[in-house]
Structures are given as C-alpha cells and as structure tokens.
Amino acid sequence: MNKPETVTENSLASDVAGPAPRHQTTKVMVGNVAVGGGAPIVVQSMTNTDTADVDSTVAQVAALARAGSEMVRITVDRDEAAAAVPHIREQLDKRGITTPLIGDFHYIGHKLLTEYPACAEALAKYRINPGNVGFKDKRDTQFSTIIELANKYGKPVRIGANWGSLDQELLSKLMDENAASANPRNARAVMREAMVQSALHSAERAQELGMPKDRIILSAKVSAVQDLIAVYQDLAARSDYAIHLGLTEAGMGSKGIVASSAALGILLQQGIGDTIRISLTPEPGGDRTLEVQVAQELLQTMGFRTFVPLVAACPGCGRTTSTTFQELARSIQDFIRDEMPTWKIKYPGVEALNVAVMGCIVNGPGESKHANIGISLPGTGEAPAAPVFVDGKKFRTLRGPTIAADFKALVIDYIDQRYGSGAKAPESVTAAE
C-alpha cells in the first residue's frame, strides 16, 4: 500500500487559486477612466451606427453605457462623421452620460482631426491603425500629424495593429530577412512579429514626437485564437504600455462568444490586459449591448470585477419541472440586469450579491443556503412548494402562480435592507413556514 504524500509548504502553494499577477503597465487616463497601472480592467464597446446620424449614434452610445460600457468607440471615417462628433458629445452630456468617446480613424484621420478641431476636442482618445495611417512617403507625415494633434489637445491614443491591415512594407522586410536566415521561422510567426513590431515602433515614434508613455495604449488584434495569445504574450514581454485586448473578426453568436472568451480568458489569467472589447457580429436585429454583457460576465466569472449580482442556476435535468425552472431563472437574471443601472446608484455594493435559482431538492436547498438569497423550486414529483433561503436559513415557502413575482419582491426587500441608506445586515430569521 502506497504511503500518503507528505504535505509540505511548497505543495500547499498550489492550493491558492487565481490569476497570475497583473502585468505592470503605465496608467493612461481616457477622459475620467483609468486604463492600466493596476486599475480595474475596463470594458469598452463600439457602435455600428452611421456616426453622421447624431440621434441614432447617441441612442446607441446611451444603450451601451447603460449596459455598462465604460468607453465607447465610434467610427470617424468622413467629413460628415467628424462634424457630428461634437454634437454627439453634447447630447450625451445633456443626458448625464459622461462615458468617454473614442474616435476610430483609418486612412484620413490626420485630415479629419485637422479640419474639425471640435471633433478633436470632443473625443477622449484617438485610435490609430499603423497599417493604414498612410502609405510610403506619406505614412510618417500623416502619423506625425495625428500625434501632434493628440499632443495639442492632450488626448491619449491607441495604436492598434490589425492582422487584416498589417503594414505591408514592414511585413515584406521581415519576410525577406526571414528567408535569408539560416533558421527561418514559419510565415505565421513572421506575421506575428510584424504585428508586434508595428505597434512598438509606432509607439516609440509617438514618444519621439513628444507623446508621453502615459498617453499611449497598444493593441495587436488577430482573428485566430492561438495567434492572438502569442502576439499579446510577446507584446507584454517587450513593453510596459497599457494594453487593450480584443479578438478581431470573432464572428456571431456562440462562435464569437466562445472564441473571444477563450482567447481573452487565457491572457487575462496570465495577467495580460488592461481593457477589453468582445467583438461580436450582431444577429440581424440583435442587441448591440450583448458584447458589453459578455465582457462583464467574462471578467466577473474569472473574479476580476463584479458588475451585477451573481445568479447561480442549475443546468436542469429530468428532475426539474418542465419549463417553470428555466423561466424563473431567466426572469430573475433579466430582472436583476435591468434594474442594475438604478441599483448601482441607490445601493452601493449590490453587485456583490449572490442569488440562487435552483430546480429540485438534490442541490437546490444546499446551493440556496450558500447564496445571500435563494429559491429551490420543486422538481418532478415533489411537493408544489418553493422554499426561500436568506443568509443560509430557511425564510419562507412560496406557492402558487406568483412565485416569480413574490421572489423578486423578496430580493428587492433583501437588497433594500442590506444595501440601502443606513442599511444593516438583514436580521436572522428564526421562523420558517
């Protein structure tokens, strides 16, 4: 019979679960939002409206901000869009929405920022793609113009290299050097190196033009998960600039969610990333705010931040009663997310609340007891009653067709007692039905 392993101090170290220490980067202020330097990982999103349409863009930015986006990027691709930016900012300010706007520039950013100073002033950050800021002799001049304008207005920049618009001159140079090497690398490795060099060389040039490091954020987006991970690992190892994470062209639906979550989850676990965006192709008529929800859920699931109360729900099986459990779990989750914009102002700390919605007696009561407030529905063949647990103790049993509404009312009462002004922790419940 084998002797049991001796537990040592070294072996106990593996008992500590959690991500690697955050990669140390330089803090950048984007409007009123801190990025990098140990600040909480920031969620950002991007509109898909025509920026020249002020009303629709304001409406979508407002929806994204309400969903929890802490920065919103808008396309600035032509004169009409640049002219609209200050009006968009003005309308958002009138609504009390202070979310920073990021201008996304390609090809003619130097021209638009020069000719529309109100646009340059209204934006909180400029995004520059070094692969299309200009070509051949014009590249350095046009890049310099944008950096000089950013310096003039005191704006940070994100220098974002992208797999689909890579600097072809740099790539050709690296490919030629690789071909002449005694130990050539494969083509994808050379492309990854071109991505990293493009971002780093551009950042160094920006600093030469007078831009301080605390106004530079880097990104290097790829559409393949493993390539993205490798690129960002290399970028982090070679610099301390603040880093924006995102998987480009992730796709729509579950494919896009899974691909982005897989790539970003690995990098975040390794301590890499200061701000993230989940780039999803929206379904026709779909909700643009889904990308914000996924980003928040990724960060919350991994323990980096808390945004909304956590709703634990079992997956359901043959023991659960038809669709009743599924409908209740969805109803409670939607209810909490819909109320959060109000709750986070009225009830500071409410995002740490844990709620359980369970489907039968196997794990239901136990899981509900571990939550702040939980409900365990009757499973198939069980008594038609749903016990509610508050802070680990049975509080009440709900019955009848109004279980969902009754449980929501109990959740609101609990939140008001625990997180309301002058609140104290809810009193222990001594009686149960």
Curated annotation (Swiss-Prot):
Q: Which family does it belong to?
A: Belongs to the IspG family.
The entry marks the following residues as binding [4Fe-4S] cluster, namely: C314, C317, C360, E367
**Matches recorded under Pfam families:** GcpE
User: How is this protein named in the record?
Assistant: 4-hydroxy-3-methylbut-2-en-1-yl diphosphate synthase (flavodoxin)
Say what the protein does. Converts 2C-methyl-D-erythritol 2,4-cyclodiphosphate (ME-2,4cPP) into 1-hydroxy-2-methyl-2-(E)-butenyl 4-diphosphate.
InterPro entries, sorted:
Dihydropteroate_synth-like_sf (IPR011005), IspG_bac (IPR016425), IspG_bac-typ (IPR004588), NO2/SO3_Rdtase_4Fe4S_sf (IPR045854)
Which cofactors is this protein said to need?
A: [4Fe-4S] cluster
**Cofactor mode of binding and number, as noted:** Binds 1 [4Fe-4S] cluster.
**Bias-annotated ranges (Polar residues):** 1-13
Task: Please list the GO biological process terms of this entry.
Answer: isopentenyl diphosphate biosynthetic process, methylerythritol 4-phosphate pathway; terpenoid biosynthetic process
Q: Which UniProt keywords apply?
A: 4Fe-4S, Iron, Iron-sulfur, Isoprene biosynthesis, Metal-binding, Oxidoreductase
